[in-house]
Amino acid sequence: MTRSLGVARAVALSLFAMVSIAGATRAEVLIQIDKSNQRMSVSVNGQHRYIWAVSTGINGTPSGTFRPQSLSRNHYSSLYQHAPMPYSIFYDGNFAIHGTTHVSRLGGPASRGCVRLHPSNAAVLFDLVQREGMGNTRITIQ
C-alpha cells in the first residue's frame, strides 16, 4: 500500500511538472516599425495582432533589430524636461517605444528619436512584452 502511494505521488508530481512547464511557455512577440509609413505592426507567434500609427524621429530613429532592454511603466525623460513617457520599452540606450500626449501628431515624424504611440496602444504593448518576456520580444525598425 505504501509503495502504491509512493508511485501515485511520483506520477502526480511528474504531471504537475509537465503542466507547469507547458504553462510557462511564452509567445514570440515581433514588433515591426515602418518609418516610411509611420506604422507599427505587432505579431504574436506569427499571427498579426495589431497595426497602429506611430511617430518616429524628426531627425531619425535608429534602424535595425533590437531586443527590449528595460521596461518603465511611468517614465519621465531625463533628457527632455521630464517629458512623460508612459509605458516605455527601452530598446537602444535612451531610445524607447512609449505613449505620447501628442496623439494628433501620430502618423508623421514628430519625436526626437523615440517611437511614440497612443497611450492606450502603448499600454497594450507594454503589458504584452511584460507578460511574454523581453527575451521573447524582437523589435525591427526600418
Where are these regions (language model features)?
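Exported/periplasmic cell-wall-interacting domains
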Residues: E28, G60-T65, S72-Q142
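Bacterial N-terminal signal peptides that target proteins for export
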Residues: M1-A12
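A short beta-strand micro-motif
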Residues: L30-D34
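Bacterial N-terminal signal peptides
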Residues: V11-S20
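Sec/Tat signal peptide C-region and signal peptidase I cleavage site
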Residues: I21-A27
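N-terminal targeting signals for Sec/Tat export/insertion, comprising classic cleavable signal peptides
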Residues: K35-T65, D127-L128, G133
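Beta-strand residues in well-ordered beta-sheet regions across diverse protein folds
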Residues: S41-S43, Q69, H98
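Short Pro/Gly-enriched beta-strand edge/turn motifs at strand-loop
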Residues: G23, Q69-L71
